[in-house]
Amino acid sequence: MNRCAENQIENVKIITADMNDFEIQEKFDNVISIEMFEHMRNYKELLLKISNFLNEKGSLFIHIFSHEFLAYPFENEGDGDWMAREFFSGGMMPSHNLLLYFQDDLKIDHVWRLSGKHYEKTSLAWLREMDNNKGKIIEIFRETYGENNAKIWFQRWRIFYLSCEQLFGYNKGTEWGVSHYRFVKN
């Protein structure tokens, strides 16, 4: 919002909500979703809901990470599934083309696929920032997760960033990457 204020842009509204329960009567010219769809599974229902938030000529921009070909759920089926349990509970790794099958209420206007090398670099940068600010972050984690869990969560986030760095850099960034979609009203 600071950037918006600096540029005298006043028609931006940031909403952070649980989309399972979210309702709003207000209509928007554009809706932007950043890394939310990975945490959802019923894309048909979600896109219907978002279409109701849009003006007649409105558009939806979606930024998600994706696999080039495979869609798979994040399932918590045991101790080894810590990432599914702690970071993506109930979510799914979508394939790049998965959203193309959900055009009942909104239709695809444009699709982009970005190499995973970008997210690899981003994950490494976040890891460095985290390591450089360990003391501050441990304090935040104490407030968030409790005294006994702060260091555990610090390590979980470190492993998360390392895992993402490796995953998105795998095979020169061609398998896992970032997908962008612009949907418009039907």
Language model region names:
Residues 20-31:
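A short acidic, Gly/Pro-enriched loop at the edge of an enzyme's catalytic core
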Residues 1-4:
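Conserved hydrophobic residues forming the short capping helix/wall of the S-adenosyl-L-methionine
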Residues 63:
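Alpha/beta-hydrolase-fold catalytic nucleophile elbow
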Residues 44-59:
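A short glycine-rich, Lys/Arg-flanked "PGG" loop and its adjoining helix->strand segment in the class I
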